[in-house]
């Protein structure tokens, strides 16, 4: 099972449904859920930090990003929270994204396995990661956001600024499936 921490974003149920469509059980929990409570459940294989409207109401997610022994994927606000937890800078975007954008993949690495070097994705955010710490590596960018995706260099921690769970994102299902593979899920392909 994948546990999804609900940061109040409009797509949290869409994340759960997208995982269900690929055969991965998922449960939505409050963003205040204790990491120890999550990790003591042997059925949970990974954590997704959802999007949401307010970075100040999701500080528990930073603790999870820093200390989880399970793989973590941050989506939108979740992506920003991971970067912030490790010392990155999150600021207002120069160009707020509420549209489809072209994502350019720099490194195929894990979540972008078999994803084309360029694809269209749905973005919906006012803030973005402006600077990442040395422990994170940029995996993808767009013309208006330099950090559309990253990976921790030593841990199974990932972030995507765009929304892989919505149908407007090309290869979004594959990106989610790749994260689930990192978590240990197997698929008949």
From Swiss-Prot:
**For this protein, what is the EC number?**
6.3.5.2
Please name the Pfam families in this protein's record.
Answer: GATase
Q: Which reaction does it catalyse?
A: XMP + L-glutamine + ATP + H2O = GMP + L-glutamate + AMP + diphosphate + 2 H(+)
Cite the Glutamine amidotransferase type-1 domain residue spans from the record. Answer: 1-189
Pathway assignment: Purine metabolism; GMP biosynthesis; GMP from XMP (L-Gln route): step 1/1
Identify the catalytic residues: 76, 163, 165
**What Gene Ontology terms describe where this protein resides (cellular component)?**
cytosol
Q: Which UniProt keywords apply?
A: ATP-binding, Glutamine amidotransferase, GMP biosynthesis, Ligase, Nucleotide-binding, Purine biosynthesis
Q: Name one GO molecular function term.
A: GMP synthase activity
Q: How does it assemble?
A: Heterodimer composed of a glutamine amidotransferase subunit (A) and a GMP-binding subunit (B).
State the protein's purpose.
Catalyzes the synthesis of GMP from XMP.
The record, for HAMAP family, names: GMP_synthase_A
- The protein's name is GMP synthase [glutamine-hydrolyzing] subunit A
């Amino acid at each position: 099972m994948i546990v999804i921490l609900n940061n109040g974003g409009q797509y949290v149920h869409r994340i759960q449904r997208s995982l269900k469509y690929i055969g991965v059980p998922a449960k939505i929990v409050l963003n205040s859920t204790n990491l120890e409570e999550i990790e003591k459940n042997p059925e949970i294989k990974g954590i997704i930090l959802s999007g949401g409207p307010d970075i100040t109401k999701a500080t528990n997610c930073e603790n999870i990003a820093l200390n989880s022994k399970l793989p973590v994927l941050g989506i939108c606000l979740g992506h920003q929270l991971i970067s912030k937890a490790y010392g990155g800078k999150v600021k207002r975007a120069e160009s707020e994204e509420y549209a489809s954008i072209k994502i350019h993949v720099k490194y195929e690495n894990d979540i972008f396995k078999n994803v084309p070097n360029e694809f269209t994705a749905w973005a919906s955010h006012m803030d973005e990661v402006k600077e990442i710490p040395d422990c994170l590596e940029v995996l993808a960018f767009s013309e208006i956001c330099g950090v559309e995706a990253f990976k921790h260099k030593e841990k199974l921690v990932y972030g995507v600024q765009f929304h892989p769970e919505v149908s407007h994102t090309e290869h979004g299902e594959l990106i989610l499936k790749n994260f689930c593979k990192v978590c240990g899920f197997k698929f008949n392909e």
